[in-house]
């Protein structure tokens, strides 16, 4: 693995812990260069990529696809419902097959935590693995686009007061972000229902009531309530959650003028955030979506650099 002039070389991208700080900053800066139109794009038509999504996705799936097509890669169609998965084929055997067919990169989202371990450790699978989200584990590409969005706004991470709010236990976005933001020097706070908070998060920040910290925040990162990962026993209503933990109009008015609001989406309007605030002046939710394409271009380029030994 290496970084030269913001050009990164990676074998796989499965978690934020696996990246050095230099690689993280290199990917962010390279994404910014793609966004500014400063990168001359090489011909990658011979490079094959398959997006293997076993959970529903709009932003991650389609922004990877846009990124791949902007880079000129050949994108292989894959529909889990129309594949041998419906006949009981395992993820491992699916990826083994794609690799045997000559696929260079597999971008994968799967409901199982750490699904990627047996794939990257396999002596037979030669395709590089990019983790598009594993269960409640990690979401490295979302984390990197979040970092780009923050860096565009403030030009730094050191000393920023950032709150990550909501469904913390079930959020792969929260886990990826808290680990790297702590490493980059941000001051982290967490809030949300106590039953969705783990003491393991104390290693990264402070659990606090939203109304105690909101006036001091630079970044408020809201998380989607992930109903699909709950057991059906919730102790709150939609309205109750919004009033207790959501970004209401009243709380929005207490934010600093320079503060920004983030959300990985999809948004549960009037739950995590008031409907009228999704596109408010302090909101950067649409910017996050746009930045996803450029960061994912940087990720795909980094994998190709690693495979082709370009650096």
Curated annotation (Swiss-Prot):
Alphabetized InterPro entries for the sequence: Asp/Orn_carbamoyltranf_P-bd (IPR006132), Asp/Orn_carbamoylTrfase (IPR006130), Asp/Orn_carbamoylTrfase_sf (IPR036901), Asp_carbamoyltransf (IPR002082), Asp_carbamoyltransf_Asp/Orn-bd (IPR006131)
Enzyme class, first EC level, given as a word: transferase
Pathway involvement of the protein, from the record: Pyrimidine metabolism; UMP biosynthesis via de novo pathway; (S)-dihydroorotate from bicarbonate: step 2/3
Substrates-to-products reaction catalysed: carbamoyl phosphate + L-aspartate = N-carbamoyl-L-aspartate + phosphate + H(+)
The keyword Oxidoreductase belongs to this UniProt entry's keyword annotation: no
GO BP annotations, alphabetical order: 'de novo' pyrimidine nucleobase biosynthetic process; 'de novo' UMP biosynthetic process; amino acid metabolic process
One Gene Ontology cellular component: cytosol
Binding site for L-aspartate: 87, 172, 224
UniProt keyword list: Pyrimidine biosynthesis, Transferase
Pfam families: OTCace (PF00185), OTCace_N (PF02729)
EC annotation from Swiss-Prot or TrEMBL: 2.1.3.2
Annotated carbamoyl phosphate binding sites: 59-60, 109, 139, 142, 265-266
GO molecular function annotations of the record: amino acid binding; aspartate carbamoyltransferase activity
The protein's role, per its UniProt record: Catalyzes the condensation of carbamoyl phosphate and aspartate to form carbamoyl aspartate and inorganic phosphate, the committed step in the de novo pyrimidine nucleotide biosynthesis pathway.
PANTHER family noted in UniProt: ASPARTATE CARBAMOYLTRANSFERASE (PTHR45753:SF6), ORNITHINE CARBAMOYLTRANSFERASE, MITOCHONDRIAL (PTHR45753)
Subunit structure, as described in the record: Heterododecamer (2C3:3R2) of six catalytic PyrB chains organized as two trimers (C3), and six regulatory PyrI chains organized as three dimers (R2).
Membership in a protein family: Belongs to the aspartate/ornithine carbamoyltransferase superfamily. ATCase family.
HAMAP family linked to this entry: Asp_carb_tr
Name of the protein: Aspartate carbamoyltransferase catalytic subunit
Origin organism lineage: Bacteria, Bacillati, Bacillota, Bacilli, Lactobacillales
Name of the coding gene: pyrB
């Amino acid at each position: 693995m290496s970084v030269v002039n913001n050009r990164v070389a990676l074998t796989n991208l499965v978690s934020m812990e696996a990246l050095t700080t230099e690689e993280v900053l290199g990917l962010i800066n390279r994404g910014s260069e793609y966004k500014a139109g400063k990168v001359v794009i090489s011909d990658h038509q011979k490079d094959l990529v398959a997006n293997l999504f076993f959970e529903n996705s709009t932003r991650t799936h389609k922004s990877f696809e846009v990124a791949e097509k902007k880079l000129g890669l050949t994108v292989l169609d894959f529909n889990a419902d129309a594949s041998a998965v419906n006949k009981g084929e395992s993820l491992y055997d699916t990826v083994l097959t794609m690799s045997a067919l000559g696929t260079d990169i597999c971008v994968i989202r799967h409901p199982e935590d750490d699904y990627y371990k047996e794939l990257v450790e396999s002596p037979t699978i030669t395709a590089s693995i990019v983790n598009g989200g594993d269960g409640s584990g990690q979401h490295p590409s979302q984390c990197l686009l979040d970092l780009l969005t923050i860096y565009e706004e403030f030009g730094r991470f050191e000393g920023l007061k950032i709150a990550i709010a909501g469904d913390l236990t079930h959020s792969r976005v929260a886990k990826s972000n808290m680990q790297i933001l702590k490493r980059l020097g941000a001051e982290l706070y967490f809030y949300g229902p106590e039953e969705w908070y783990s003491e393991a998060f104390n290693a990264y920040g402070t659990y606090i009531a939203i109304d105690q910290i909101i006036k001091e925040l630079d970044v408020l990162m809201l998380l989607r309530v992930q109903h699909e990962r709950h057991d059906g026993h919730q102790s709150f209503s939609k309205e109750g959650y919004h009033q207790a933990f959501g970004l209401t109009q009243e709380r929005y008015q207490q934010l600093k003028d320079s503060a920004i609001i983030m959300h990985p989406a999809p948004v549960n309007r009037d739950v995590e955030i008031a409907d009228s605030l999704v596109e408010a002046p302090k909101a950067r939710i649409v910017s996050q979506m746009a930045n996803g394409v450029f960061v994912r271009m940087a990720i795909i380029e980094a994998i190709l650099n690693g495979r082709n030994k370009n650096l």
